[in-house]
């Protein structure tokens, strides 16, 4: 199964097992994902299903997006997300809903989100560089990165050099997290461990690649 769900991170809590062990979980609220389009090999060159969730005012839509929602007869959502279909995988109908019942407790999933932005940070925090000596003549350079290259040859800093810069606010995927509980009545997924992003940010839940 390659179809996933678009949800919203609600925060973290913990639950207790029958043995009394405390398990940290992330609560993901998954409103029913509405199918807006089904792509096929004949018409688009590949098989995929396009979904949306939540709601959005019509005045905030582009003409292209408004036309697509009108064509499919689906209420406009926050964003459009596409999931590729595996060969032979059955596609849902346009206008139908995909709910949390897609997953079950004990299943492994990959969760994708946008990590918290931490602004401009130095090499020690951004790349876990060790700090320089506190003594032995060193002053004002305890958290400096040190040498970043050579001299006249090559006369430049190589691309990809680990230096200070923007930390966070990037797309991150955490793989093989276990679903502890599925609450179909309240549209909730309880996933063991932490997932990327701040509270109320959008996350994508897919079946784990390494478990397929």
UniProtKB/Swiss-Prot annotation:
The lineage of its organism: Bacteria, Pseudomonadati, Pseudomonadota, Gammaproteobacteria, Oceanospirillales. Methylated by PrmB. GO terms for biological process: translation. The modification N5-methylglutamine is found at residue 152. Keywords: Methylation, Ribonucleoprotein, Ribosomal protein, RNA-binding, rRNA-binding. The gene is rplC. Part of the 50S ribosomal subunit. Forms a cluster with proteins L14 and L19. It comes from Chromohalobacter salexigens (strain ATCC BAA-138 / DSM 3043 / CIP 106854 / NCIMB 13768 / 1H11). SUPFAM superfamilies: Translation proteins. This is Large ribosomal subunit protein uL3. Belongs to the universal ribosomal protein uL3 family. GO terms for cellular component: cytosolic large ribosomal subunit. One of its GO terms (molecular function) is structural constituent of ribosome. InterPro entries: Ribosomal_uL3, Ribosomal_uL3_bac/org-type, Ribosomal_uL3_CS, Transl_B-barrel_sf.
């Amino acid at each position: 199964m390659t179809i996933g769900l678009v949800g919203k991170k609600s925060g973290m809590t913990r639950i207790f097992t029958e043995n009394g062990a405390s398990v940290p979980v992330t609560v993901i609220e998954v409103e029913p994902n509405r199918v807006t389009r089904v792509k096929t090999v004949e018409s688009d060159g590949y098989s995929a299903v396009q979904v949306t969730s939540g709601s959005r005012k019509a005045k905030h839509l582009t003409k292209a997006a408004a036309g697509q929602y009108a064509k499919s007869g689906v209420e406009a959502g926050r964003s459009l997300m596409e999931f590729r279909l595996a060969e032979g995988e059955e596609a849902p109908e346009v206008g139908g809903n995909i709910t949390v019942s897609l997953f079950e407790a004990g299943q492994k999933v990959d969760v994708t989100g946008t990590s918290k932005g931490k602004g401009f940070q130095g090499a020690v925090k951004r790349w876990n560089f060790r700090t320089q000596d506190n003594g032995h003549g060193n002053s004002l350079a305890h958290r400096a990165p040190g040498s970043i290259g050579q001299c006249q040859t090559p006369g430049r800093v190589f691309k990809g050099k680990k230096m200070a810069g923007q930390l966070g606010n990037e797309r991150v995927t955490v793989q093989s997290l276990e679903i502890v509980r599925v609450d179909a009545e309240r549209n909730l997924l309880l996933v063991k461990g932490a997932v990327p992003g701040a509270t109320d940010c959008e996350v994508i839940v897919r079946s784990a690649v390494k478990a397929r």
